[in-house]
Swiss-Prot record:
Gene Ontology BP terms: autolysis; carbohydrate metabolic process; cell wall modification; symbiont-mediated evasion of host innate immune response
Enzyme class: hydrolase
UniProt xrefs under Gene3D superfamilies: Glycoside hydrolase/deacetylase
Cytoplasmic-side positions: 1-5
Taxonomic lineage: Bacteria, Bacillati, Bacillota, Bacilli, Bacillales
GO molecular function: lysozyme inhibitor activity; N-acetylglucosamine deacetylase activity; protein homodimerization activity; zinc ion binding
Name of the protein: Peptidoglycan-N-acetylglucosamine deacetylase PgdA
């Protein structure tokens, strides 16, 4: 009896052992199946994203599998920049592991790829960590970017700097600074009182910097804003700075807005300063509309605020709006910060009412020097015909001066704050029309993108500010 009991016990133990081994084996099978499934999913993800244009590297450290996907260039070579970033992340992770050799996990190093143009590719390397949950499956524990966005040449795989993607010039720096200021104004995060501080953004462009991102439509820059603890990523439309982008890296999908051009060879641009005025500007607009004439208004930001709706009407009726400062000081006698205040407050005032930023600027009294022109950050529009309407306050004299100075390509200076100027307009337009003139805005007069730091007097007379 005792022997029989012993035999039964041994059989039971054997059965339990077999079952235990079977369970363990099944768990290992399920675990292996789960592991293979995760790897297959990641392989499929990368093939779907990049068509298999990569090389997979596998290794094991401290019980953890590390699987890396290295992209290839158009020359079918490993992208050394991405490989280096993944290598640094791998080394750092291995140092942190210190896990028991029985601990099992998988760390994937993948990349997100975005072609910005035929000759440039934007990459971001990503780490995904899977760990064992229970005894039979893997689950995603953590996913994170392991490096900043990297822009490389599609052909060579070489890391691109901002100075290679953009055209190295002072004009590029000025264009980009103005574009960034406007994008920040659009956010609505800056009050009228504080918006001038955006002018303090300096050293925005460093030609050797690589910490930028680029898409098919935007370039994204980290910008240190005065008073802000961390840099802010600012998106600038490539179409807005297309003239400053190296053609090799400018996406063909970017549509650069065409500058309207005049239809005839006898053109004249009428311009009005110091408005809008609630008592005069509406009458000026009525007369222009009646004659189907377009003009350019250089507005004061303070007057835009005091007379809401008029600058919007100017734009809606097809006129161009430029800046004339906030409250008409001589900018060459102001501090740098005050120049920023004068310009950016006006930009914000016009944008808040219209969704539009003035693209040109006429400094009060025409006073400008090289430093102020760069601080303004907009092309400078001067004039070739001064009616001196502010001095004479006589409608007949205003008309006479316009007619005496009128030539093809002339820019005429008037003010839409004087009733005598408004009264002169009907006769002035009628007589100019009889002489065959086409009335154009400043943009139409030149028919091309104007330069920051340059001043324009008429169609044939433009020069860099000194």
């Amino acid at each position: 009896m005792k022997i029989r009991w012993i035999r039964l016990s041994l059989v039971a133990i054997l059965i339990i052992a077999v079952v235990f081994i079977g369970v363990i084996g099944f768990q290992k099978y399920q675990f292996s199946k789960s592991r293979n499934k995760v790897i297959m999913q990641m392989d499929r993800l990368m093939k779907d994203q990049d068509g298999g244009n990569f090389r997979r590297l596998d290794k094991k450290e401290n019980g953890v599998e590390i699987i890396s996907y290295i992209p290839k260039t158009t020359e079918k070579k490993d992208n050394e920049i991405i490989q280096k970033e993944i290598g640094k992340a791998t080394d750092a992770e291995v140092k942190k592991l210190n896990r028991d050799k029985e601990t099992q996990g998988i760390i994937f190093y993948t990349y997100q790829k975005h072609r910005m143009a035929e000759q440039a590719i934007s990459y971001k390397a990503v780490q995904s960590e899977y760990v064992k949950e229970g005894r039979t499956k893997f689950v995603l524990k953590d996913k994170k970017d392991i490096c900043k966005n990297i822009v490389t040449d599609a052909e060579t795989g070489a890391l691109l700097t901002l100075g290679e993607v953009l055209i190295k010039s002072n004009q590029t720096k000025l264009n980009l600074k103005t574009a960034v200021e406007e994008e920040l104004i659009k956010t609505g995060d800056f009050s009228l009182k504080d918006v001038g501080n955006l002018g303090k953004i300096k050293s925005l462009v460093k030609w050797n910097q690589t910490d930028f991102e680029i898409t098919n439509s935007e370039i994204i820059l980290p910008v240190k804003i005065p008073g802000a603890p961390e840099p802010k990523k600012v998106k600038v439309k490539l179409a807005d700075i297309a003239s400053s982008v190296n053609k090799r890296y400018l996406p063909s999908s970017v549509k650069v807005p065409e500058v309207p051009k005049a239809k005839t060879n006898k053109r004249i641009a009428l311009t009005f300063d110091d408005g809008p005025s609630s008592s005069v500007t509406p009458g000026v607009l009525d007369t222009l509309k009646r004659h189907n004439v377009k003009a350019t208004f250089f507005v004061l930001g303070s007057s835009v605020i005091q007379n809401p709706g008029l600058v919007k009407r100017e734009l809606e009726e097809g006129h161009q709006v430029g800046s004339h400062s906030w409250d008409h000081p001589q900018l060459t006698k102001q501090s740098t910060q005050e120049v920023y205040n004068q310009i950016l407050k006006t930009q914000k005032a016009v944008f808040d009412q219209t969704g539009y930023f003035p693209t040109t600027m006429r400094p009060p009294y025409g006073a400008v020097n090289k430093q102020v022109a760069e601080e303004i950050g907009l092309p400078i529009i001067q004039w070739s015909v001064d009616t001196e309407d502010w001095k004479y306050r006589n409608a007949g004299i205003v008309t006479k001066k316009v007619l005496a100075g009128a030539t093809d390509g002339a820019i005429v200076l008037m003010h839409d704050i004087h009733k005598t100027t408004a009264a002169s307009l009907d006769t002035t337009l009628t007589k100019l029309k009889s002489q065959g003139y086409e009335f154009v805005t400043i943009d139409e007069l030149y028919g091309e993108k104007l330069q920051i730091g340059k001043q324009y007097f008429d169609k044939t007379d433009s020069r860099m500010v000194k």
